[in-house]
Every structure is written in C-alpha cells, then in structure tokens.
C-alpha cells in the first residue's frame, strides 16, 4: 500500500497530461486503506453529481475522482486511471463477489504491474491467469521488474500466449542479456536488449560481517564520521532487539535513532515514514548526519531513501539488489548535500551483509544455527547459500551489467545445490508446485461462459495471497471510563489499527490488556464489528501495555 500511495502522489501531478484538456477522467487509488490518504480524499468530487456525472467546473477538486468510483473497492477499477495494489486486479479472475465489475473495469485498459519478481508461487500463478484473461480480451499488459528470472519470464510469456491462442517460446538469455525487453503480440514475439543510460549505471561493493557485535561497531564508526546508516533486518524481533541495544550502548543519541517495522499502528507508521523521508530521503541535507535507522523489509521498495552506509541481514539476491538500491541512491557532496550533476563525493558504496561464516559444504542447519529468525523468514536456505556464494565470487553488484548473472546464479534451473540442502530443496519444490496447483484451482474457468460451473470455490474463502492468516488489532485508551481511539484526528479508529500474524498473536496475546465484557460489546456495536472476532488492546503505560509509539507492538519482549 505504501508503494501504491507513493505512486499515486506522482501520478496525481501528471495524469491529466494523458487526456485532452476538456476531458474529465477520474484517478482512483485502489486499495483497502485509501480512506486514510488525505490527498486522495481531497481529490474526490465533493459536489452532488447527477445525470452525466459532470462536476462543477468551479469546484477546485473536480479534477480528481468522482465520488461514485470512490465509495466502493468493487467499482474502483471502473475509473479511467487507477493506481493501487495488484490484488485489486487479481480479484477479477478469482471467484470474489462482483468480480465481473473488476473485469469490466480492466476492459480496454492497459494493465501495468511493477516489481512482479516479488510475487510468490501462488501470486505468480494468479498473475498468469490475469495476464491470460487480459490477452484474450484484447487488452495490453506491461510487466516491469529489475530482478526477474528467466524461468519467471517464460511463464508470463506462456500465459499471454495462451490468451492470444498462439504458441510462442521466448529465446534463452545469456548472463549479459540485461536490460531486456520481451514483447508478445498476436502475430509476433520480439526479444531484444534495451539500451541504458550511463548515469543510471551503479556499482556497489560487497562486504561481509559475521556477528551482530561487528555490525554495531560499524554503526558506531559511521556515526562518528557523521554518516547516516541503515541496518535492514529480516525479522521484527531482531530489529527491536538491536534498536534497544543501541539505545543502551549510548553509541547513538536517542534522538538520532529510528526504528521502522510492520508492527506499528497506521498512525505511528505514517509518522515514522515521514521522519524516514525527512532524514534519509532525496531532499535531506544536514539533518541526515549521524542518523541511524533500524528497519525491516518495509523500506526495501516503498520509500525513496538514500543512505550513506548500509548493513543488511543475508537475504535472497533479488532482495539484496533492492536494498542496495537504497545505498547512495542520489548524487551528493561529501557533506551529504544533494548535487544536480557530477560525481558523488562520498566514499565508495559498500553493502555490508551479516551472514554465517562461509562454508563450501554446508549442513542443513547452516543458516538456522547462526541466524535463527532469518532462517524462519526465508526458509529456502539453499537459495540463501547460493546468494552468498555468487556475491562472494563477484564482490560487487554492478547494475545493470551483472543483474542477469546474479539472478540466474540463484534462481536458474541449472544451479547446483549442496547435498546438505537436499531435504530443504525437496520441501521447497513441493511447496512451490503445491501452491501453484492450489492457485490454479482458485482461478475462474471462463471457458463455459457466465455460469455456475466457472468455479467450485466460495467467495468468502478467497484471498489473493497465500500467507498465514493475520489478526486485526485496535489500540484504545480509556479516558474517564470512555473507550477512545489511540490515534487522534480524522479516521481515528482506522489509524489505530495494526495487523499481526495469527501465530504471533496466539503466542503473545496473554501479554496484553484487552477490552472485554460489556465495554467490548458496546464498542463493537458502535464500530459495527463482530464481538467474537474483534480484539481491542488497551494502551496505558508502555512498560505494562506492550505498545509504544517508538517501538510498536512487542508485548513483554525481553522481560
């Protein structure tokens, strides 16, 4: 959603250039939390429309989004231009209620999807079904990725080919074939290299750290030099623990230290995003000196930040490439001030990776014995080992020159996996094919036409993502006996929400004071929530309530 919000901000400044001056198209933000974005809310035509749905020309916000499109997610794609999460389009080819409205909204439109390499096996198969349907309806699809493997590309090409009812096979690519354009039409397949501008070429050296103590020392050195530095951790608990260690060590002043992860209420998350952009964003200047951010994957793609130095936990190679893109992203002088042109005056960028000691013949517990939480977050340990191997061999991430080599050395079909990961590799392959098969069952079968036989699944069981179930939590304060939202201002209850994994909540729910009994019943009646499923956490003193604006939801962690 953060990525969609950022793109909406950019599109809002340019989208009218796509239309004639006298046109009145609508620009919609299509995701479930759009009501929380002020700029979108301000763009909705506030006048009462009727008949032709023409807005009042004197209305300053009339060049935005008609209210009729904005009052329901199922109608969002009917707007002329939409920016949102891919889920909103994927629901068109799954048995969700009103999926026909979404299909209608996609008709005669170009579907443009970015960062498609991030789709897991389930989402990739749903995306293939969406692409096939787009092609069969005569619509264009544009897919973008900086780290797409050849295997993924071939599946996407095959999906579009099925839609246009012709059999094509994209040519094999060499390690130097990047950037690359593949175009499939009803009559031909074009596959060719794309020229890149010299100014977008980047080179980031790789360094290795093998203990958290070494990482903390590096942070201290960066702060002493006046550099800003980020440490991207793979788990929330690891991020919080290091944040606390830095606070206790006094290496970094509290006001220069920031923590950012997914277990913050929307209210605090928006504030932290703004702080992050102010301290580490493109326009940051003197205020960035000596600043430290400990974060998780939330800053990999959605925020345009620019760090002088960076540490990352070992992660799959495509994610490390994304993280490296937040290191010295913009040209600056030696004091960290943005330059319009010329050479960057900072030290050579180095992505330092916290990883296990290198082992040519790793055992099954190679990763879990050194980085337990990372092993849980990224269970394909063989790909993690392959990532470390290729980065050790190359020593540098050179973009775009080495992109294909790096990706295919980890995700290619012909990679040699160590014997120690044989069991893990079998489990991962089994899960991959199982997830794809399950996703195939969830796709609508359009062949019989508009009838009950197009799906055997029930809409209430649908999800665009195959992931562990999450729990929605509301944060509340008790003021003079009255239950009030944690956040203030407009949409206060929505801004007081956060979501956590079901397993995490089952493990930690006993550590929180929760609303129950008659107060919970009254709250549910007021907020139109189901009493059997609603969970409201009472926020009081941080030491006992398990939530703070600076650390997020942690329970009794470390107690």
Predicted regions and their residues:
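Conserved RecA-like ASCE P-loop NTPase motor core of nucleic-acid helicases/translocases
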Residues: 1-4, 142-144, 228-234
């Amino acid at each position: 959603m953060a990525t969609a919000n950022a793109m909406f901000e950019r599109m809002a400044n340019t989208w009218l250039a796509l239309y004639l001056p006298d046109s009145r198209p609508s620009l919609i933000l299509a995701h479930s939390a759009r009501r929380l974005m002020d700029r979108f809310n301000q763009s909705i035509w506030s006048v009462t429309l009727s008949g032709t749905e023409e807005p009042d020309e004197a209305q300053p916000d009339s060049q935005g989004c008609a209210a009729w499109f904005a009052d329901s997610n199922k109608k969002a794609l009917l707007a002329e231009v939409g920016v949102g999460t891919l889920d909103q389009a994927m629901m068109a080819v799954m048995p969700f209620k009103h999926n026909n409205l979404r299909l209608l909204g996609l008709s005669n439109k170009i579907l443009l999807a970015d960062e498609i390499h991030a789709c897991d096996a389930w989402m990739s198969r749903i995306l293939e079904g969406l692409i096939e349907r787009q092609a069969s309806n005569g619509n264009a699809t544009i897919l973008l990725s900086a780290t797409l493997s050849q295997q993924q590309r071939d599946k996407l090409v095959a999906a579009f080919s099925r839609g246009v009812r012709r059999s094509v096979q994209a040519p094999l690519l060499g390690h130097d074939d990047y950037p690359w354009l593949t175009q499939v039409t009803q009559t031909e397949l074009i596959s060719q290299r794309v020229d890149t501008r010299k100014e977008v070429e980047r080179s980031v050296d790789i360094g290795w750290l093998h203990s958290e103590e070494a990482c903390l020392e590096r942070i201290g050195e960066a702060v002493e030099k006046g550099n800003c530095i980020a440490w991207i951790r793979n788990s929330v608990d690891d991020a919080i623990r290091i944040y606390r260690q830095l606070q206790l060590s006094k290496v970094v002043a509290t006001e220069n230290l920031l923590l950012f992860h997914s277990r913050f209420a929307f209210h605090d998350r928006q504030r932290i995003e703004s702080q992050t952009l102010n301290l580490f964003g493109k326009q940051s200047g003197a205020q960035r000196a000596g600043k430290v951010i400990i974060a998780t994957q939330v800053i990999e793609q959605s925020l345009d930040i620019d760090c002088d130095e960076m540490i990352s936990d070992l992660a799959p190679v495509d994610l490390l490439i994304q993280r490296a893109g937040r290191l010295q992203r913009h040209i600056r002088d030696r004091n960290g001030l943005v330059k319009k042109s010329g050479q960057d005056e900072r030290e050579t960028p180095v992505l330092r990776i916290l990883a296990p000691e290198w082992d040519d013949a790793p055992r099954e517990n190679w990763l879990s014995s050194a980085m337990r939480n990372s092993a849980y977050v990224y269970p394909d340990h063989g790909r993690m080992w392959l990532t470390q191997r290729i980065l050790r061999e190359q020593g540098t991430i050179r973009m775009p020159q080495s992109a294909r080599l790096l990706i295919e050395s980890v995700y290619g079909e012909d990679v040699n996996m160590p014997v120690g990961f044989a069991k893990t590799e079998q489990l991962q392959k089994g899960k991959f094919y199982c997830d794809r098969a399950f996703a195939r069952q969830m796709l609508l079968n359009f062949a019989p036409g508009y009838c009950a036989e197009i799906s055997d699944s029930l809409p209430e069981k649908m999800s665009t993502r195959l992931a562990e179930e999450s729990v929605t939590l509301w944060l509340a304060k008790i003021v003079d006996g009255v239950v009030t939202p944690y956040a203030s201002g407009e949409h206060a209850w929505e801004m007081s929400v956060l979501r956590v994994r079901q397993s995490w909540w089952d493990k930690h729910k006993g550590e929180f004071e929760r609303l129950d009994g008659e107060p919970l019943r009254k709250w549910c009646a007021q907020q139109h929530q189901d009493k059997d499923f609603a969970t409201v956490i009472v926020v009081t003193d941080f030491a006992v309530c398990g939530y703070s604006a600076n650390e997020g939801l942690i329970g009794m962690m470390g107690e």
